[in-house]
Amino acid sequence: SKCIEGIIRDASELSEHNSEKGALLYIAMTCDTESEENRSSFLDFVENIRPKLSEFSDSLNRRLVEHEAVGNLPARYDLMIRSMKNDIDIFRKENIPLGVEQTRLVTESQTINGAMTVEFDGNEYTLPEMRRYLESNDRSIREGAWKAVVNRRMQDEERLSEIFDELVSLRHKIAKNAGFETYTDYMFRAMERFDYSKEDCLEFHDAIEAVCVPLMREINSERVGTLELGSLKPWDVNEKTGVGPDLHGRAPLRPFENVDEMVEKLSTLFHNMSNDLGEKFDKLVEMDTLDLDTRKGKAPGGYQYYLQKSRVPFIFMNAAGLQGDLETMIHEAGHAFHSIYCSHLELIGERGYPIEFAEVASMSMELMTQDQWGEFYDADDADRARIGHLEGVIFLLPWIATIDSFQHWIYSNPEHSREERASVWNSIRDRFGSKMDWDEYSIFRDVSWQQQGHLFGVPFYYVEYGIAQLGALQLWRTQRKDQQKALTDYSNAMRLGNTKTLPE
């Protein structure tokens, strides 16, 4: 078994190098989607390097798990061997070129989204920058901003629909090649969802519909009544986050003027929580692995990418000075803390924590920092921010159910038409959303799923946010009673990495 342990260590080191190379190329591509050099370098890695690595990894996995001494390995290797066996079960050589084509299509969708800007109020803005106008107390400004964004999105709707059609077809072939009836079944194995089933997800949807949807609709009903809107329009509230104009006519929350101010105040915030978190955040800043501003040509969204060889987290986001941006940065910092807490673990397989628990690290950090938001606001605005964030949890869970339910249908019916897709999407929106008047923009509602990048780039990665939100709320409840215990529980859990199962 000592020989096998040595091979596992060597393979881990090789994986670290390869993972970091791919990470750096992906980061460069998303930071500047207009760079042909960045895009071609990333795709060259995907098309020419990663396929060879996949075959090598499969060959090595088979030799390891079939070795007569594998049963004598120490318990620390149990979960790694389980993952190897799972990878062997679903690996098919004929899926490698399909995976390459999938990445090429996803990259094209990111390039399309990164190039989107709109002319509004005499200036050119990125779509993240336009979000500030959707918080305006002037309904006509909100309407104009929303329509400007929608009209721009509709210019690329056809190509994005084509890309998604191709992705669904590719993914169904991948599943069939691997011996699965649907891509849903395949992904439950590929994502190592050993601890819950499709049926559990559907039951979770039902629970969200029963508990959260009525609360969300009540909040929106109050919005319509208080603001005397007559009816709720899509520019009156963000259905994913609950963000909209203030019910009492107060100016929108603006926690920072620029990224430097946000970073400086977050350093103080984390130091106020604990020296440990403060020092970890300062380390992130010192390492200069942050790209936080929004700009033309930058991919949408936010992420944390851990550089496995350097053991350094990289944070990417599109900050435009909004409360939502502050929450995003805290969210990604939570991921980075998780990565740093795991960095003491020797093997890459030990550091690769379950996705569901990865999101506990980030979502609980959002909740646990709330008491410190006075660093960015006076007392009244800090309360507004906290209330808005907690209401956002109520809005987010139905949105998670929406996206997850949509994906379950998509991949159970891979030969669906676009008309069927629009019809099912709208019925799911009706089930988990609020009554909303779309007027002549119902054509955009049909394809509004395109705004959720996960559907293109990371299929089935979404219900994890809901599972993690429950874990985050539990940790927040602990914090309300005992701040130090919550921080200790947080750090102890994060240090485990992938050495324990999700329930453990």
Question: Model-predicted segments: where are they?
Answer:
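A well-structured
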Residues: S1-P252, K265
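A glycine-rich phosphate-binding loop feature that marks nucleotide/adenosyl-phosphate handling sites
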Residues: R223-L247, K283-D293, P354, R386-L390, ...
